[in-house]
Amino acid sequence: MNFKTSAALLSAAIAVSSCVAPGPSQQTSMAPSLSRGPAVDGRWIDRNGIISTFQNGAFSTRSTDTNTLLASGTYVTISPTLYEINMTSLVRNTQSRVNCALVSPSQLNCTTDANSQFSLTRQG
């Protein structure tokens, strides 16, 4: 359905619904909204081909070639577009904090606690 058709149908529906007053037996039901995970959930890749996965508060990074776990940790949502990752590098045996900004649905710009910057691109 194209935009013009959708807009016309929506306008018609609003016009018709404004003509009908709800009676005492009619009840307005508010359907529960489906809970979705954070916007950052999913698989992301950096410019070196390293895959990072965000899933329900858990974070992991794996190599592309051997699927070796390189880092793992947790993340929290600071705002709808800001995320804080606390992770342990299994390669360096260090802990670090990374702040990431979701600048578009397909790009995360991140800064480590050592002020290194990198970007991740959503996969698939």
From Swiss-Prot:
Signal peptide: 1-18
Lipidation (S-diacylglycerol cysteine): C19
InterPro entries per record: Omp10-like
Chief location of this protein within or outside the cell: membrane
Compartments (UniProt record): Cell outer membrane
Record's GO cellular component terms: cell outer membrane
Disulfide cysteine pairs (residue numbers): none
Record flagged with keyword Lipoprotein: yes
Keywords annotated in UniProt: Cell outer membrane, Lipoprotein, Membrane, Palmitate, Signal
N-palmitoyl cysteine lipid attachment residues: C19
Recorded topology in the membrane: Lipid-anchor
NCBIfam families the UniProt entry points to: omp10_alpha_prot (NF041251)
UniProt family annotation: Belongs to the rhizobiaceae omp10 lipoprotein family.
Protein name (record): Outer membrane lipoprotein omp10 homolog
UniProt source species: Agrobacterium fabrum (strain C58 / ATCC 33970)
Higher taxonomy: Bacteria, Pseudomonadati, Pseudomonadota, Alphaproteobacteria, Hyphomicrobiales
